[in-house]
Amino acid sequence: MIASLLPAEDSMTASPLRFILKTFALALLLSAGVAHADKYVLISHAPDSDAWWNTIKNAIKQAGEDYGVQVDYRNPPSGDLADMARLIEQASAAGYDGVIVTIADYNVLQGAIGKVTAKKIPLITINSGTVEQSEKLGAIMHVGQPEHAAGKGAGERAKAAGVKSFLCVNHYATNPASFERCRGFAEVIGVDYKKSTLDSGDDPTTIESKVAAYLRQNPNTNGVLTLGPTSASPTIKALEKSGQAGKLWMATFDLSDDISKGIKSGTVQFAIDQQPYLQGYIPVAVLATMKQMKTTDLKKVMEAVKANPKTQKRFAEYGLTPVYGDRHISSGPGFVTKENISKVEKYAGQYR
């Protein structure tokens, strides 16, 4: 019977993935007769102060409603990765039907994540980390934006605009994956990303002060890249106070009300949109569908998710376009500019 739940050899020949799915198939069978509401958890690396994650919280809530499951959200209040590892370990012992995690730091988290897969709990990784790391951890799939590629995409636009030196404002330097954004950008314009990156911390007043000081001390800087709303809003304030808003080239990752206003005013050239809603919604949809269909055939599961009327309605309403691969799903990058901001600002910070 377990064999009937597995994809045919010719449709999925990668033995590591087949082993993962065989393990989860057994777990599905063992739990098939248990009468309880399916329950999942998403554990992120984000501190409580990072409002960007509200979109993902909204996504898992709506996915739970659409698929009739319960989804919890857990995070380390201060963003401490040791705390995150403990949350993952706790989740492995809490009886969840599936676990969703960010790979904020592979080396720090691999032990804790290993406890999840050791108990044959289905795992999906999102947001931070690479597909290679996701596969090494035994995850079913990764849903996220290739960070280095996104940085390069931003760098190409900056280079075309004449940017030759830049400041990368990193408000979450505790996450090694964050530097991939800066590195990709720097490679395109031909500078050292380490010399161009500012560990700003996440306090708005401190970020504004540090950015202003850097630009005073490095007057030849002709571009600024911020890594999200937490660093973008204070940077916009710093540029406005120094009279450089709209004069010094600026771009950012992600969306918020302040960023939308900045794009419309010309202060921000574009926002790199990783469609975070997808990172929350799709993993819940996939895990719930696997459980409900009692199958680990990813092709069938993804087709079912794509065909789900409630899912289709959500994505159409919010203007979201995931890119489905054979195993992994890319949520971005997309670029929000003055030309298309009106299409997305209605839901910025909520569902975009």
How should each PLM-predicted stretch be described?
Residues 33-37:
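Sec/Tat signal peptide C-region and signal peptidase I cleavage site
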Residues 51-66, 150-154, 176-193, 210, ...:
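Short, solvent-exposed amphipathic alpha-helices that sit
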Residues 70, 111-149, 256-264, 268-269:
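Flexible loop/hinge segments that line or gate small-molecule binding clefts
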Residues 101-118, 185, 200-262:
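Hydrophobic alpha-helical
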Residues 84, 141-166, 207-208, 255-259, ...:
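Hydrophobic alpha-helical segments within soluble ligand-binding/sensing domains
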Residues 188-189, 286-352:
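Hinge/cleft segment of the Venus flytrap/periplasmic-binding protein
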Residues 39-67, 72-88, 96, 102-106, ...:
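Extracytoplasmic "Venus flytrap"
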Residues 42-44, 95-103, 122-126, 167-170, ...:
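Periplasmic-binding protein-like
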